[in-house]
C-alpha cells in the first residue's frame, strides 16, 4: 500500500512532562497531555505496552468488526502504531486510513506500510472529513479515560456511509462513569441498531495492576 505523508491539522504546545506508562495513559486529562505522552512513548509502545502487558483489545475489535460484516474503506481512529489495522489485515483485505492525535505514533504506524494514508485529528473536535466517506470506522483503546468522551462517537457515525459499520472499544469504567450508553441512545434513531459486548483488555497471563480491566465493544450499524 502507498503511504502518504501525514496531513498536519493540529499543532500543540506541550505542558508537563509525561513518563510513558499505562497509569499515565489512564490519567490523561487534555489533548495536549495525550500528544505529550504518546510522543514520548511512540518508539517503544509496541514492546512496552502491547507485548509486555499482553494487550489484546485490538484483536477483539477486529474480530467483532469482521463478524458483523465490516468491509471496504476503513478509518482507524486513534490508530496509534497500527495494531488494530494489523489485526484487521490478518482477517482479510481492507483499505485502511489512519488518524491519531499523535504525529509520532502515526510515524511508527506509517513505517509498517499498512495504511493508504494517515492524518492528524483531535476527537474533541471535528474529524476533518466530509460526511459519509467510509464503509467502516474502528477504534481500539482510544475511549479509555481522560479527554475523549461519548460525544466523540457522533463524529464516527457522521463520517460513515449509510449501511456502514462502526466498531469501537470503550473502557468499562469509562463507559459507566460518562454514561456512554445514554449518548448512544440519543442517536440510536438515526442508525439501524447497535450491540454491546464486554471483553477482557489484557491476556490471561498478565500480572500488572490493570490486568482484570474490561472493555465494552460497541458495534453500530449505520
Go through each PLM region and give its residues.
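A short beta-strand submotif of the Rossmann-like class I SAM-dependent methyltransferase core
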Residues: 139-142
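N-terminal, positively charged/glycine-rich alpha-helical extensions of SAM-dependent methyltransferases
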Residues: 8-44
Amino acid at each position: 500500500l502507498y503511504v502518504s505523508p501525514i496531513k498536519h491539522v493540529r499543532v500543540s504546545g506541550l505542558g508537563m512532562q509525561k513518563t510513558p506508562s499505562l497509569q499515565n495513559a489512564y490519567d490523561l486529562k487534555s489533548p495536549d497531555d495525550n500528544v505529550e505522552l504518546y510522543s514520548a512513548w511512540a518508539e517503544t509502545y509496541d514492546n512496552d505496552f502491547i507485548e509486555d502487558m499482553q494487550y489484546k483489545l485490538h484483536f477483539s475489535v477486529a474480530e467483532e468488526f469482521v463478524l458483523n460484516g465490516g468491509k471496504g474503506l476503513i478509518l482507524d481512529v486513534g490508530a496509534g502504531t497500527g495494531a488494530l489495522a494489523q489485526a484487521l489485515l490478518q482477517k482479510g483485505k481492507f483499505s485502511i486510513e489512519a488518524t491519531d492525535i499523535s504525529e509520532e505514533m502515526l510515524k511508527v504506524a506509517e513505517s509498517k506500510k499498512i495504511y493508504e494514508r494517515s492524518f492528524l485529528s483531535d476527537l474533541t473536535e471535528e474529524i476533518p472529513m466530509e460526511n459519509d466517506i467510509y464503509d467502516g470506522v474502528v477504534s481500539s483503546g482510544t475511549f479509555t479515560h481522560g479527554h475523549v468522551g461519548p460525544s466523540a462517537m457522533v463524529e464516527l457515525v457522521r463520517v460513515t456511509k449509510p449501511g456502514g459499520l462502526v466498531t469501537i472499544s470503550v473502557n468499562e469504567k469509562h463507559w459507566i462513569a460518562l454514561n456512554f450508553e445514554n449518548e448512544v441512545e440519543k442517536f440510536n434513531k438515526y442508525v439501524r441498531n447497535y450491540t454491546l459486548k464486554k471483553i477482557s483488555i489484557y491476556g490471561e497471563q498478565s500480572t500488572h495492576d490493570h490486568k482484570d480491566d474490561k472493555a465494552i465493544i460497541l458495534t453500530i450499524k449505520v
